[in-house]
Amino acid sequence: MWVYRLKGTLEALDPILPGLFDGGARGLWEREGEVWAFFPAPVDLPYEGVWEEVGDEDWLEAWRRDLKPALAPPFVVLAPWHTWEGAEIPLVIEPGMAFGTGHHETTRLALKALARHLRPGDKVLDLGTGSGVLAIAAEKLGGKALGVDIDPMVLPQAEANAKRNGVRPRFLEGSLEAALPFGPFDLLVANLYAELHAALAPRYREALVPGGRALLTGILKDRAPLVREAMAGAGFRPLEEAAEGEWVLLAYGR
């Protein structure tokens, strides 16, 4: 196993993370001011990183030791080897290539917002489901969730995570267009990025019932005005905003 070590944090290096996965990274780990990207062998990358060969057992043991439960009240996101005795609702997620382990601000913002806005029995769309953590959380709150993702590689992991948590959301390969025939939905949650939210704003309205709610995150603070303008133009009314670090969540009503 080879590690490509970059100075910085996952948040600071967020713009280049897709390029690491496109280059063949099997996973990422933030540790002591660095981001480690794991590869089966060195490849040419256009970044200022350093390659280092590590033993599979060495890095895996260190990674497991450093990975802590992630609190997002009323939830806690756990790896399968974690134990937890608190009162929070457990979400057991196998860390891997799919986004959504609870260690990123946007995932925590979305989990907390789900708890505030989801009503038991709601039909929920998780757009860009990744690990399935938001769809799983919606089911645990009494919703009926559909998770969609354009990356077919993440869906088996999402399904395995759902089974691990004893819930049965439906997962589907595709974009928002693929989800529309299963709607309209009472609640939409999407952890994407500002420009895509802005482009999809009219389609979000189409996906929701009258009075439905849209929870949008993956938005950097300085890009939030773009989303606000697009959602207002699509006829949405603002419900709330929440922030953590450099990231925001914007909630809207249809």
Swiss-Prot record:
Annotated protein name in UniProt: Ribosomal protein L11 methyltransferase
Statement: the UniProt record of this protein carries the keyword Transcription: no
Disruption phenotype: Mutant contains unmethylated protein L11. Null mutant is perfectly viable.
Reactions this protein catalyses: L-lysyl-[protein] + 3 S-adenosyl-L-methionine = N(6),N(6),N(6)-trimethyl-L-lysyl-[protein] + 3 S-adenosyl-L-homocysteine + 3 H(+); an N-terminal L-alpha-aminoacyl-[protein] + 3 S-adenosyl-L-methionine = an N-terminal trimethyl-L-alpha-aminoacyl-[protein] + 3 S-adenosyl-L-homocysteine + 3 H(+)
Family recorded in the similarity comment: Belongs to the methyltransferase superfamily. PrmA family.
Chain sites annotated for binding S-adenosyl-L-methionine: T107, G128, D149, S175, N191
KW Cell cycle (keyword) present: no
Location within or outside the cell: Cytoplasm
Keywords: Cytoplasm, Methyltransferase, S-adenosyl-L-methionine, Transferase
Gene: prmA
EC number assigned by the record: 2.1.1.-
Principal subcellular localisation of the protein: cytoplasm
Classification via Gene3D superfamilies: 1.20.5.1350, Sun protein, domain 3, Vaccinia Virus protein VP39
Pfam families in the cross-refs: PrmA
GO molecular function: protein-lysine N-methyltransferase activity
GO biological process: methylation
An example Gene Ontology CC term for this record: cytoplasm
Lineage of source species: Bacteria, Thermotogati, Deinococcota, Deinococci, Thermales
Role played: Methylates ribosomal protein L11. Preferentially recognizes free L11 before its incorporation into 50S subunits. This function is dispensable for growth and thermostability.
Free-text domain note: Contains an N-terminal substrate recognition domain and a C-terminal methyltransferase domain, connected by a flexible linker.
